[in-house]
């Protein structure tokens, strides 16, 4: 083989080796950095742009795609200890002609975290309303989507600000009062009774606890490498004290059943999506909501746990699209009558 050709392969091999070695080093030494790069990459790939908006001295961080049009904008509220990027797996399957807005909930990721902030569900609803007003998102009624804690906030928001919301999608929402507690809730009550807030299952501080949380929240058993588990923990640990404070606030007497107390005030067309194998919030909550909300459609997903957005993103996106189409067509037909 010609020496120049050999040199070419050596140079090419060396050039390729640099990014490969950088990736391996990141994976082994800085897995949390790799996770941040992953989200950045997916936002860029899906056309989601990150922006900031302020209400007085309070900062909201959000991502968006598209512009307001004749179809309702979609505002998406994430769950406890998550962030706006949790919706990316669903965004992937949503049409690009929809105006999407995913906001970091109060105290999460790029949104202001203040020791003076009211973290109750009512407090969060007021903050989200401030965000909506800042963006003038309620210039025309929008479609509101929320999951878990975000679902609780979304439901209460629709009850408090009915003129803002054209339709509602609640994905396994928190905030309902069950006749009997499931194993997860029983465990939480035991921890509250013993004041062992360090052991809340939804606030992991080791890779092992992170793995347990993933098993609790999902029916699908994801095989997550140890380094990625470590990275997920590393990203969360600096925020765990805040998560504990928030958790104690949303399970307090003031907030615990706030969706239950307001569900009969929800008047907009509503879609409920719930995983049948949810171990965190029992699927019977869907029936409770359906009995209290007049115009309500329930979708129960087989072989799916609490992390509906992570486990069934394509199905979730399709259900949202189909529901929006049915509501939109009904509204158009009413205008023609």
From Swiss-Prot:
<dbReference type="GO" id="GO:0046889">
    <property type="term" value="P:positive regulation of lipid biosynthetic process"/>
</dbReference>
<feature type="domain" description="AB hydrolase-1">
    <location>
        <begin position="72"/>
        <end position="313"/>
    </location>
</feature>
<dbReference type="GO" id="GO:0009395">
    <property type="term" value="P:phospholipid catabolic process"/>
</dbReference>
<dbReference type="GO" id="GO:0098978">
    <property type="term" value="C:glutamatergic synapse"/>
</dbReference>
<keyword id="KW-1133">Transmembrane helix</keyword>
<dbReference type="GO" id="GO:0031966">
    <property type="term" value="C:mitochondrial membrane"/>
</dbReference>
<dbReference type="GO" id="GO:0016020">
    <property type="term" value="C:membrane"/>
</dbReference>
<dbReference type="InterPro" id="IPR000639">
    <property type="entry name" value="Epox_hydrolase-like"/>
</dbReference>
<dbReference type="GO" id="GO:0045211">
    <property type="term" value="C:postsynaptic membrane"/>
</dbReference>
<dbReference type="GO" id="GO:0030336">
    <property type="term" value="P:negative regulation of cell migration"/>
</dbReference>
<keyword id="KW-0458">Lysosome</keyword>
<dbReference type="InterPro" id="IPR000073">
    <property type="entry name" value="AB_hydrolase_1"/>
</dbReference>
<comment type="function">
    <text>Lipase that preferentially hydrolysis medium-chain saturated monoacylglycerols including 2-arachidonoylglycerol. Through 2-arachidonoylglycerol degradation may regulate endocannabinoid signaling pathways. Also has a lysophosphatidyl lipase activity with a preference for lysophosphatidylglycerol among other lysophospholipids. Also able to degrade bis(monoacylglycero)phosphate (BMP) and constitutes the major enzyme for BMP catabolism.</text>
</comment>
<keyword id="KW-0472">Membrane</keyword>
<keyword id="KW-0967">Endosome</keyword>
<protein>
    <recommendedName>
        <fullName>Monoacylglycerol lipase ABHD6</fullName>
        <ecNumber>3.1.1.23</ecNumber>
    </recommendedName>
</protein>
<keyword id="KW-0378">Hydrolase</keyword>
<dbReference type="GO" id="GO:0005765">
    <property type="term" value="C:lysosomal membrane"/>
</dbReference>
<dbReference type="GO" id="GO:0060292">
    <property type="term" value="P:long-term synaptic depression"/>
</dbReference>
<feature type="binding site">
    <location>
        <position position="306"/>
    </location>
    <ligand>
        <name>(9Z)-octadecenoate</name>
    </ligand>
</feature>
<feature type="active site" description="Nucleophile">
    <location>
        <position position="148"/>
    </location>
</feature>
<feature type="topological domain" description="Extracellular">
    <location>
        <begin position="1"/>
        <end position="8"/>
    </location>
</feature>
<dbReference type="GO" id="GO:0032281">
    <property type="term" value="C:AMPA glutamate receptor complex"/>
</dbReference>
<feature type="binding site">
    <location>
        <position position="149"/>
    </location>
    <ligand>
        <name>(9Z)-octadecenoate</name>
    </ligand>
</feature>
<feature type="active site" description="Charge relay system">
    <location>
        <position position="278"/>
    </location>
</feature>
<dbReference type="GO" id="GO:2000124">
    <property type="term" value="P:regulation of endocannabinoid signaling pathway"/>
</dbReference>
<dbReference type="GO" id="GO:0047372">
    <property type="term" value="F:monoacylglycerol lipase activity"/>
</dbReference>
<feature type="active site" description="Charge relay system">
    <location>
        <position position="306"/>
    </location>
</feature>
<feature type="topological domain" description="Cytoplasmic">
    <location>
        <begin position="30"/>
        <end position="337"/>
    </location>
</feature>
<feature type="transmembrane region" description="Helical; Signal-anchor for type II membrane protein">
    <location>
        <begin position="9"/>
        <end position="29"/>
    </location>
</feature>
<dbReference type="GO" id="GO:0005886">
    <property type="term" value="C:plasma membrane"/>
</dbReference>
<dbReference type="InterPro" id="IPR050266">
    <property type="entry name" value="AB_hydrolase_sf"/>
</dbReference>
<dbReference type="GO" id="GO:0052651">
    <property type="term" value="P:monoacylglycerol catabolic process"/>
</dbReference>
<keyword id="KW-0812">Transmembrane</keyword>
<dbReference type="GO" id="GO:0004620">
    <property type="term" value="F:phospholipase activity"/>
</dbReference>
<dbReference type="InterPro" id="IPR029058">
    <property type="entry name" value="AB_hydrolase_fold"/>
</dbReference>
<dbReference type="Pfam" id="PF00561">
    <property type="entry name" value="Abhydrolase_1"/>
</dbReference>
<keyword id="KW-0735">Signal-anchor</keyword>
<comment type="similarity">
    <text>Belongs to the AB hydrolase superfamily.</text>
</comment>
<keyword id="KW-0443">Lipid metabolism</keyword>
<dbReference type="GO" id="GO:0046464">
    <property type="term" value="P:acylglycerol catabolic process"/>
</dbReference>
<keyword id="KW-0496">Mitochondrion</keyword>
